[in-house]
Each structure stands twice: as structure tokens, then as C-alpha cells.
Amino acid sequence: MGESSSPDSLPRKNILITGLPGVGKTTLIMKLVTRLKALEPMGFYTAEIRERGERVGFELVGLDGRKAVLSHVNIRGVHRVGRYGVDVQGFDAFLKTIPFQAGETGLAVIDEIGKMECCSSHFRRLIINLLESDKPLLATVAMKGGGLIAEVKLREDVVIHELTPEKREMLLEVLTGILS
């Protein structure tokens, strides 16, 4: 971790956070977004949709507060991950409203690069474009998965950090230092 603290000087400017489900990846992303407001981050995170105490889907929450359904047990169609139907058209429409490449944006944020999100070819292209852009990408990525999930982990321009309960606070400080 003896890397420079400026993203511009890092050969690996893209930061991927992985870890077991429920370890706190989204919470870490949200804390980093709060600390890095000066970079005017653009992107989204994913939150559970719960009904009567049971998880029934996932929603997308833009850093600007907008929301859209990503998946739900009641969505029918060809795109399914487990018991959830994925609303690929709605996801694509949501993504197109986020100005990831706006001039004032200094950080792209994606939570997460996972199986549901990868149902969208638009999302897969967006991730490659963000990784190859001159702006840093801060993203969570599923621990397991093929295709894009595996591909992004092999790129030379990424640094992968595995989040564990023991490393939560330390990783928050390290990533704040690298990205600010």
C-alpha cells in the first residue's frame, strides 16, 4: 500500500471492493462518497426492497437520490437471477440518466458489478468505458461470477480490496487517502 495518494499518478486508478454478502461493501461505498464529495462523484448503489420483513428485490439509488427497481420476485421475463426477475430495460434507462463523464465529475461509483447488473449489455459496455476513462472508478464487485465479473478482476488497471469485518475502518481510511 505504498502507492501515491493521487489517482492521476496511479497506474491502477480503478478500485474494486469485494467481499462476502452482508459484509458492508455498500456501507463502505456510501461512507467514501460522503468523504469524497469534493470529487463530485456520479453513480449509484443498490439497496434491498423489503416487504413484510422479507427481501423481495433490489432497487437502484442514484447518488442524486433518484430510484429505480433493478429486480423483484414479481418481475417476469427472460432475465432472472435466482428468484428475481431483472428489469434490464428499466436499468438501462436509469443508467443513461447518470452523467458519468461530466466534466466536473472526478469519480465514478458503481455498486455493484454483479450477476443482475451484468444481464444488461449496456451496463457491461459502460463498465469497460469507465475502466478505460481517465477518471477513477470505485466499484463493488461480486466475489464469484464469470464473464465481466471475472474479467474486471484480471485487468492491470484495477486494485482489488477484499472487505472483511476486521478491515472495515482501515479500508475506509486507506481508500479515502488514495482517492482524495
Annotate each predicted stretch with a short phrase.
Residues 25:
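Conserved lysine of the Walker
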Residues 33-81:
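N-terminal phosphate/diphosphate-binding loop that engages ATP/GTP or pyrophosphate donors
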